[in-house]
Amino acid sequence: MVKDSSKHTRRTSVPQGSPKVGSEPNKIAAKTPFDFSGKNLTPYGGLLPVATMLEKLGFKQLVEETLTVHRIPRAMSIYQFLLAIVLAIYVGFSRLNHLRFVAQDPMLTGVLQVGELPPQSTFWRFAASLALPVAKQLLVLQRVLRQRVWEAARVRLETITLDTDTTVHTLYGQQMGGRRSYNPKNKGKRSYQPILNFLAETHEYVGGELRNGDRPRGRQIARHLDNVFAALPACVGQIFARADAGFYCWEAIEA
């Protein structure tokens, strides 16, 4: 006995309603009006003044002229990736995974002019694609931005005090460069010892270096200080240095 298969086949349902149309991203710029007492306030409304400041400082043009990235991402431009990371740091996020909390926030997406942020894996691939020369280019970008901020704020410090110190970053696992060295909170564990420099007068971060867990030597300290001095604005003429006993060596004094 032959059965007609068409009688026992379930018909496919026809989609109802109009097809979904993708909405255009919001466009928020320096000329966008804002209010601090209106309704429907976003918790990240403070990003608008930050984005306005970066726009007036020429951050986009500076990124396009300074950074050389051979792998061009598709989700967003290089400037949009860097701006998203910078704004996330202003919000208080310390990990790229935290960007998922603001992936569809109208303020952040409006500043970036995108519909929504790409997933975390896209940000990680973008960061992994950056070559080592990009790190020096970012320092150049930071130096130019500091110079422009000082000129806009009319800050003219001819004499400054530079604070230099190391910190301990405990490692969990077998990361490259980890050493068992000075680690008072987690004795015996591997760690890194980054060097950080701050400007005492303005509390600005001037420069830093991610190092292994060994104690820095005299030549390393001198080379690091030379790079920090080069990042200072041109108006600085006299520099006073403050550091603990671990940095006291003849190479550092000569630098």
Identify the residue ranges that each predicted region occupies:
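A short alpha/beta connector and helix-capping loop motif
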Residues: 176-179, 250-255
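Short, hydrophobic/aromatic alpha-helical segments in well-folded domains
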Residues: 224-228, 242, 252
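Internal, well-ordered domain-core segments that constitute the primary functional module
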Residues: 233, 245, 249-252
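Acidic/histidine-rich, metal-coordinating catalytic segments
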Residues: 165, 238-248
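Dynamic "connector" segments at or just before major functional cores
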Residues: 1-215, 219-234
